[in-house]
């Protein structure tokens, strides 16, 4: 047994309690990362459209920048969900933690992701996470929902379950921290 796998990690936040969610009626589902083909942003937009066909009390945030940003803005508009979709642009440092703490669900639908630390950051501040089975972190995160990146129905169902079933939200939030 000469080989040991050492996975990526995030530094623990010294004062995680400082990041609190603002009480609100609408739920917030966040994609945070580069808006590029590898990250699967179009799957996030399509999953959002399907969730919004079932319920209207959810808002979707795409935080980040990249070569597909304009395409995603147009896709959200073409899908008829622009009024429920927000694009923040690039976030860094404290802004990342604040955005994730405001999220009821974090989603990483990556097509190709060697590891991906953003779900770890999300779970650290209590945001339940839905991640792509194709990401490296899928092998170590036991308290995240895992879907194939192309399975938009599974993603939409997972989002809907977390935002509509408080027990599921609570369990994923508490077990993820």
Q: What does each of the following model-derived ranges do?
A:
Residues 9:
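Carbohydrate-associated surface elements
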Residues 22-48, 61, 173:
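Conserved donor-binding/catalytic core segment of Leloir-type glycosyltransferases
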Residues 73-91:
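Nucleotide-activated donor-binding/catalytic signature segment of Leloir-type glycosyltransferases, i.e.
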Residues 90-91, 98-103:
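Short alpha-helical donor nucleotide-sugar binding micro-motif in glycosyltransferases
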Residues 111:
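Aromatic "clamp/platform" in nucleotide-sugar-dependent glycosyltransferases that forms part
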Residues 128-131:
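Short hydrophobic beta-strand element within catalytic cores of glycosyltransferases
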Residues 144-153, 161-166:
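Conserved acidic donor-binding segment of nucleotide-sugar-dependent glycosyltransferases
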Residues 161, 168-177:
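A short, well-ordered alpha-helix in the C-terminal region of glycosyltransferases
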């Amino acid at each position: 047994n000469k080989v040991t796998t050492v996975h990526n990690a995030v530094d623990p936040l010294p004062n995680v309690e400082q990041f609190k969610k603002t009480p609100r009626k609408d739920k917030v589902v966040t994609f945070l990362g580069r808006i590029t083909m590898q990250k699967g942003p179009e799957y996030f937009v399509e999953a959002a459209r399907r969730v919004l066909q079932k319920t209207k009390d959810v808002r979707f945030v795409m935080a980040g920048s990249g070569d597909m940003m304009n395409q995603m803005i147009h896709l959200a508009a073409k899908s008829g969900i622009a009024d429920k979709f927000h694009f923040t642009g690039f976030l860094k440092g404290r802004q990342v933690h604040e955005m994730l703490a405001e999220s009821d669900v974090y989603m990483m639908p990556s097509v190709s992701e060697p590891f991906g630390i953003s779900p770890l950051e999300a779970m650290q501040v209590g945001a339940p996470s839905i991640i792509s089975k194709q990401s490296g972190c899928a092998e170590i995160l036991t308290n995240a929902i895992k879907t194939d990146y192309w399975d938009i129905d599974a993603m939409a169902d997972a989002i809907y379950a977390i935002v509509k079933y408080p027990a599921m939200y609570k369990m994923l939030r508490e077990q993820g921290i």
